[in-house]
Amino acid sequence: MTDFLIAFGSQTGQAETIAKSLKEKAELIGLTPRLHALDENEKKFNLNEEKLCAIVVSSTGDGDAPDNCARFVRRINRNSLENEYLKNLDYVLLGLGDSNYSSYQTIPRKIDKQLTALGANRLFDRAEADDQVGLELEVEPWIEKFFATLASRFDISADKMNAITESSNLKLNQVKTEEEKKALLQKRIEDEESDDEGRGRVIGIDMLIPEHYDYPEISLLKGSQTLSNDENLRVPIAPQPFIVSSVSNRKLPEDTKLEWQNLCKMPGVVTKPFEVLVVSAEFVTDPFSKKIKTKRMITVDFGDHAAELQYEPGDAIYFCVPNPALEVNFILKRCGVLDIADQQCELSINPKTEKINAQIPGHVHKITTLRHMFTTCLDIRRAPGRPLIRVLAESTSDPNEKRRLLELCSAQGMKDFTDFVRTPGLSLADMLFAFPNVKPPVDRLIELLPRLIPRPYSMSSYENRKARLIYSEMEFPATDGRRHSRKGLATDWLNSLRIGDKVQVLGKEPARFRLPPLGMTKNSAGKLPLLMVGPGTGVSVFLSFLHFLRKLKQDSPSDFVDVPRVLFFGCRDSSVDAIYMSELEMFVSEGILTDLIICESEQKGERVQDGLRKYLDKVLPFLTASTESKIFICGDAKGMSKDVWQCFSDIVASDQGIPDLEAKKKLMDLKKSDQYIEDVWG
């Protein structure tokens, strides 16, 4: 028997990508793994009948299970299951997460604990990969342990194991003097400038042009002397090629309808794509202020789709955000296909491929255009992973570039990869600017670029037909290896929208962060005490809560009870970035909000955590109350989620005279009972 199970729970696709990579590597050494989402348990597999399972899973939202894993988590936690239900199962588990969130690794830990409780045997320690420091730092050692386990379990020879790793003896040209080092770097710069002036520009087509950047001595372009001199780099085998694109000499017929990403299913999406109309687009802060991030507001009209969506306060919608044309043009030009990018392109499986069970990705059309694929289907902004860098190394005519790219995807170069690629968030374009002689085959990019994921935005209004969203502009300067200043992918696109534009959106599955909470009637929401914490644009979702309560009070006064509804709103300076202050003050004057507490970090040195400590009398009842109250936290996760969590823990510990660990357990009880609910983002 050479088969075993690989199961994943993935919201954004990272866990699924790792799981697929495990499957491909296992097949290279002669095994026959089966790959399934965890929610396919009791449908396409039965965990209690498996002998070996590798699980790759993440947490999402407020410590929630990914949408293709939530059912699995519920099923393995049934009280009816016996303690030895999984006694025949050996398993390994890799958890993915982001330590900026207070709910870090919640689901991987929960699954691990429950599998053990049901009698399963974990073969080695669970790994917890942290996106804040680089997933690879934990993922790669875990994969090595897993394949060592497979080698032992299935008696796989050393020769076969060599099929998934290789050593590279390619060395940098021996550069001994400072003058020679400078000459080498100067050649890189000249190659790059030549690329800008020649290959990088096409008459009549706008093209992304890099900004000048002086790379430090140790950087993306050159590693340490130790790494540069290592003659035995352990680099992964390049992924097997399997796609062939055939471009005809004619355009795609005008009546061809290319549905968004081939209508490929995505976890958390509950509708097909549909068009909405942009009815307003405006600034909500001064766009010329240098003190704050610019914030904007977009309103869309759902039209006839309003009844289908039936959104509630706290719900979000996905926007189908495309890649910028300048970047798409540059990448297609570097691949040598820009001049045929708008002609009909047909994808097929290479009949000579050695890849087992090769399939065209479901999110791309088999008949399409290269421009359409690279604009709407493939993520060119996400930092390239090591498999893609491995392919880039094979796509350059410069041996020095090849050596450095091999270093970046090698086991020895993992820290360099994290420091110079993953952490600064380099894009594919940044990598191509840095290595001007890399000309990747377009088919390899189609195979290896991840799916372009739509961007979710919570709605800040409560109307049947229209939805308002508020967002901060994200800025990324040309530093740390990024070769062009840019805004966030969604920011740039949202900024371009004008009244009358039509855009595609998708309905998002309701989460726990909503009013009324799941399982509660609309009328009962008017009796619910609320503590809301919203720094920055985090306050926007609470506007939808308050508009809903205002309508409830107008339509059904008897259901609107005088209970505490407290909002802590964090901003830098209320005179410049306290967005929708007049709206919030209206809610106070009408009795919708009982308390509006403004925390100004720049003017008064007060963050929302300081406000919570200052107004203990308003906060404590929510930390000791029954299930009839709710705490909602919304905002940027960069430290805020953990800091607010610690603040509440400090308050509980001080009030009850208990240790911090015990206070955190009490807070965790609030989370488990859905009294403490977060909606935070990175």
UniProtKB/Swiss-Prot annotation:
Q: Which gene encodes it?
A: mtrr-1
**Enzyme Commission number, as recorded:** 1.16.1.8
Question: Pfam family of this protein, just one?
Answer: NAD_binding_1
* Binding residues for NADP(+): 293, 607-609, 643
The cofactor named in the record is:
FAD; FMN
| Amino acids binding FMN | 93-124
Q: Which GO terms describe its cellular component?
A: cytosol
Where does this protein hold FAD? 455-458, 488-491, 681
What domain of life? Eukaryota
Q: Which UniProt keywords apply?
A: Amino-acid biosynthesis, FAD, Flavoprotein, FMN, Methionine biosynthesis, NADP, Oxidoreductase, S-adenosyl-L-methionine
Q: Which reaction does it catalyse?
A: 2 methylcob(III)alamin-[methionine synthase] + 2 S-adenosyl-L-homocysteine + NADP(+) + H(+) = 2 cob(II)alamin-[methionine synthase] + 2 S-adenosyl-L-methionine + NADPH
- What PROSITE patterns does the record point to? FAD_FR (PS51384), FLAVODOXIN_LIKE (PS50902)
Which processes are annotated in GO (biological process)? homocysteine metabolic process; methionine biosynthetic process
Gene Ontology terms, MF aspect: [methionine synthase] reductase (NADPH) activity; flavin adenine dinucleotide binding; FMN binding
Residue limits of the Flavodoxin-like domain? 4-147
| Enzyme class, UniProt record, top EC level | oxidoreductase
Question: Could you tell me what this protein is called?
Answer: Methionine synthase reductase
Q: What's the stated role of this polypeptide?
A: Involved in the reductive regeneration of cob(I)alamin cofactor required for the maintenance of methionine synthase in a functional state.
What organism is listed for this UniProt entry? Caenorhabditis elegans
Q: FAD-binding FR-type domain location, by residue?
A: 271-516
Q: Which residues form the signal peptide?
A: none
